[in-house]
Structures are given as C-alpha cells and as structure tokens.
Amino acid sequence: MELLGEYVGQEGKPQKLRVSCEAPGDGDPFQGLLSGVAQMKDMVTELFDPLVQGEVQHRVAAAPDEDLDGDDEDDAEDENNIDNRTNFDGPSAKRPKTPS
C-alpha cells in the first residue's frame, strides 16, 4: 500500500509525493499506514515550509508598522461595542410593558 500526492506549484510544475505504507514483516497494516501518513506529513511540511516562510517575510515587509496579531478589526471599535452583547442565558433585561 502507498500514499500518493501531487502538488502543482505557482509555475504549473507538478511535483509528485509517494510514500510506501508497508509494515515490516507480518506487522499490523494499520501501523504501516500510520507510519506512511506521518512520513507524508513530513514531506508536505518540507515542501511548504519555504513557501510559508517566504509569505511571512513578504507580509512583514509589506506592513511593518501594523500589528500582525491576526485581528483585522479595529481595537477601538471593539472597545466601543462591549455593552452591545446579547444575553442568551436568560430573559431579556428589558421590563415588560404594563397595560395602561
């Protein structure tokens, strides 16, 4: 048994990934599969690591003054909307209207 994968880069050049999942001797075939999946994961990590590092460096160079915490919203806007939360734990905080 083997795992196959193919990555097509930005230039359109395909790169094939192949890992054998044979268990040594009469070993458990699922152990062989688990080992193959771990090997494939390592191969994919090695393949994408330079691409990810290049993307991170590109983003840092493009926006050196911005905080790269992943929060795209304005923090001041978040502070202004603290009291606008919905209470799902109980009844509405509004008083019911009394008949007049």
Curated annotation (Swiss-Prot):
Cellular compartments annotated: Nucleus
N-acetylmethionine: modified positions: M1
Pfam family name, one: DUF4611
Keyword Nucleus carried by entry: yes
GO biological process: tRNA threonylcarbamoyladenosine modification
Protein origin, superkingdom: Eukaryota
InterPro entries reported in the protein's UniProt record: GON7_meta
Region of interest called Disordered, as start-end residue ranges on this chain: 61-100
GO cellular component, one term: nucleus
Record field: compositional bias (Acidic residues): 64-81
Cystine connections: none
Record carries keyword Ribosomal protein: no
Disorder named in the UniProt entry: Galloway-Mowat syndrome 9: A form of Galloway-Mowat syndrome, a severe renal-neurological disease characterized by early-onset nephrotic syndrome associated with microcephaly, central nervous system abnormalities, developmental delays, and a propensity for seizures. Brain anomalies include gyration defects ranging from lissencephaly to pachygyria and polymicrogyria, and cerebellar hypoplasia. Most patients show facial dysmorphism characterized by a small, narrow forehead, large/floppy ears, deep-set eyes, and micrognathia. Additional variable features are visual impairment and arachnodactyly.
Functional note: Component of the EKC/KEOPS complex that is required for the formation of a threonylcarbamoyl group on adenosine at position 37 (t(6)A37) in tRNAs that read codons beginning with adenine. The complex is probably involved in the transfer of the threonylcarbamoyl moiety of threonylcarbamoyl-AMP (TC-AMP) to the N6 group of A37. GON7 plays a supporting role to the catalytic subunit OSGEP in the complex.
Subunit structure: Component of the EKC/KEOPS complex composed of at least GON7, TP53RK, TPRKB, OSGEP and LAGE3; the whole complex dimerizes.
Protein name, entry field: EKC/KEOPS complex subunit GON7
